[in-house]
A protein has these predicted regions:
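Bacterial carbohydrate/catabolite-sensing allosteric modules
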Residues: 1-169
Length: 169
């Protein structure tokens, strides 16, 4: 996004999840977005919309909020935490007359099948599911064989699948 000249970049996503016995009030994608904007010197103040479940309805509601807050000055782009949320965001933008990608760009995460059927079609990060599964199985086997809790931070390959909701420079 930044290499395409986008400087005002917002975030739209859900909140919280439970893993094991631990509840996490903030989704890791939002944490990554905050870190990323800080490192790049981007101001995301007032451009983060994160609440609710990872659903189309949540996306529509948060998309409507973003339009109401920025109708006359839409951010250059939004990163959306999941394709299901992005479907609702695109619906809200279309209903409000916000044209994607002319008025703002949208990039999502997961590259689910629905991404190719939205209007406009959704640019989305594809996460290598095979690599993710292999890594999880390897980590599980290590934890079982060592009989102790191991903590790993692992980066999984992603590929940006460019469709109509974002036109790179």
């Amino acid at each position: 996004l930044v290499s395409s000249g986008k400087r005002r970049i917002g975030y739209i996503g859900g909140t919280g999840f439970t893993m094991g016995l631990h509840e996490y009030p903030e989704d890791g994608r939002l944490t990554a977005f905050r870190n990323w904007t800080e490192r790049l010197g981007l101001d995301a103040e007032g451009l983060i919309y994160a609440q609710g479940a990872f659903t189309v309805d949540t996306g529509r509601t948060l998309g409507e909020e973003a339009v109401n807050d920025h109708r006359d000055d839409m951010p250059d782009a939004f990163i959306v935490a999941a394709d299901t949320i992005a479907v609702g965001v695109l619906q809200a933008f279309t209903a409000a007359g916000v044209l994607v990608p002319r008025d703002t760009s949208v990039i999502s995460i997961n590259n689910q099948a629905i991404a190719q059927y939205t209007s406009p079609t959704l640019t989305s990060y594809d996460i290598d599911q095979n690599e993710l599964a292999d890594t999880a199985i390897t980590m599980l086997a290590e934890a079982i064989s060592s009989r102790r809790t191991l903590h790993h931070h692992t980066f999984i390959s992603t590929t940006l699948v460019v469709r109509d909701s974002f036109v790179p420079a």
